[in-house]
Amino acid sequence: MAAPMEVAVCTDSAAPMWSCIVWELHSGANLLTYRGGQAGPRGLALLNGEYLLAAQLGKNYISAWELQRKDQLQQKIMCPGPVTCLTASPNGLYVLAGVAESIHLWEVSTGNLLVILSRHYQDVSCLQFTGDSSHFISGGKDCLVLVWSLCSVLQADPSRIPAPRHVWSHHALPITDLHCGFGGPLARVATSSLDQTVKLWEVSSGELLLSVLFDVSIMAVTMDLAEHHMFCGGSEGSIFQVDLFTWPGQRERSFHPEQDAGKVFKGHRNQVTCLSVSTDGSVLLSGSHDETVRLWDVQSKQCIRTVALKGPVTNAAILLAPVSMLSSDFRPSLPLPHFNKHLLGAEHGDEPRHGGLTLRLGLHQQGSEPSYLDRTEQLQAVLCSTMEKSVLGGQDQLRVRVTELEDEVRNLRKINRDLFDFSTRFITRPAK
């Protein structure tokens, strides 16, 4: 069986004939071009291996193509303002877009706009999901990086503004890029900023693991899959390699190009805007405002290929080519629905839209029925009260009552455990 093909997907801000170009990583052969406007920075996303999404530069819509129908624009997803960044969940169920200082979350299966998050104070500059789609991270020009639990966002009370799980405020200037490693809720996140630092965080605890200070502002950051190396693109065109596994235990360190001359990629003549690493970690892809995309050998730091584009590069990423990209007979499993511009229920009350099923998870119910945990706590309180009154007599009746209450507590605990096990299996069941 042949190894999966790796492809480079690139966009620039001035191409008159196409919006996105796809070429084979190692041979440089041009495979596909998608037509229809220019994609903005951090504005490219692959949806479920079937659709390509591109947030149009300075426009209030997102273009969507079927991977094989490259010359036919499938849909324009309208937004209330220019889209500043875009991403799709790895499981293909959700799409996130930054519009000014707000984050819009759509459900792909129905096209419903589920929630608008407004916790940033300035424009959102970058968005990314964790590998298991359980969390997403947002960075903004307000110098903040926010970690969101998708489950908490979807279950939030509509009358309250959802709160992020973590707020990282250690950067002093706007966030330029972020990269989330593998590990789901245990992943590490690298963030870059105009304050000339790159910081490494842990999603689960929210702790700052590492801060690296450079001589220039850092415009792009990425890591290899093994997280041995962190690559940082500078505003003057250099790319710096930070070896994570060789560092001592200190949390802060400065990167000196003179001392670390063997860890610098030199070739770009303007700021580096995007970085991506191949699956095996041997090749680095970079895009720059000098209108070139370069392919580097990580070991030797030599440029092995240069591709000239028509304008400043806005996106450049290495992807494993999905089957739908290489097969002319492939068609999406489901058509892309119309994406709604307004929040679910804003125009149609609380009734679900036709053609879809609305599930409201975790919303407060109309009744006030206590949960099993509340009932258990109440029974335990009654049990303690009864035991305190045992000195008043009726020892036999008390023992019978205590036994009954203990049996009831055990029964409720079993019900609670069974309900938890069922919920876990249902939530973690793979999508068909």
Curated annotation (Swiss-Prot):
Protein name: WD repeat-containing protein 18
Annotated gene: WDR18
PANTHER family linked to this entry: WD REPEAT-CONTAINING PROTEIN 18, WD-REPEAT PROTEIN 18
Gene3D superfamilies: YVTN repeat-like/Quinoprotein amine dehydrogenase
Function summary: Functions as a component of the Five Friends of Methylated CHTOP (5FMC) complex; the 5FMC complex is recruited to ZNF148 by methylated CHTOP, leading to desumoylation of ZNF148 and subsequent transactivation of ZNF148 target genes. Component of the PELP1 complex involved in the nucleolar steps of 28S rRNA maturation and the subsequent nucleoplasmic transit of the pre-60S ribosomal subunit. May play a role during development.
Subcellular location: Nucleus, Nucleolus; Nucleus, Nucleoplasm; Cytoplasm; Dynein axonemal particle
Signal peptide (from-to): none
Domain of life: Eukaryota
Ranges: WD repeats: 36-75, 78-116, 119-158, 170-211, 213-257, 267-306
Family membership: Belongs to the WD repeat IPI3/WDR18 family.
Pfam families in the record: WD40 (PF00400), WD40_alt (PF14077)
Description of how the protein assembles with itself and partners: Component of the 5FMC complex, at least composed of PELP1, LAS1L, TEX10, WDR18 and SENP3; the complex interacts with methylated CHTOP and ZNF148. Interacts with NOL9. Component of the PELP1 complex, composed of at least PELP1, TEX10 and WDR18. The complex interacts with pre-60S ribosome particles.
SMART domains per record: WD40 (SM00320)
Record-level GO BP terms: DNA-templated DNA replication; rRNA processing
The keyword Nucleus is annotated on this UniProt entry: yes
Organismal lineage: Eukaryota, Metazoa, Chordata, Craniata, Vertebrata
PROSITE patterns the record matches: WD_REPEATS_1, WD_REPEATS_2, WD_REPEATS_REGION
Gene Ontology terms: cellular component: dynein axonemal particle; nuclear pre-replicative complex; nucleolus; nucleoplasm; rixosome complex
Keywords (A to Z) from UniProt: Cytoplasm, Developmental protein, Nucleus, Repeat, WD repeat
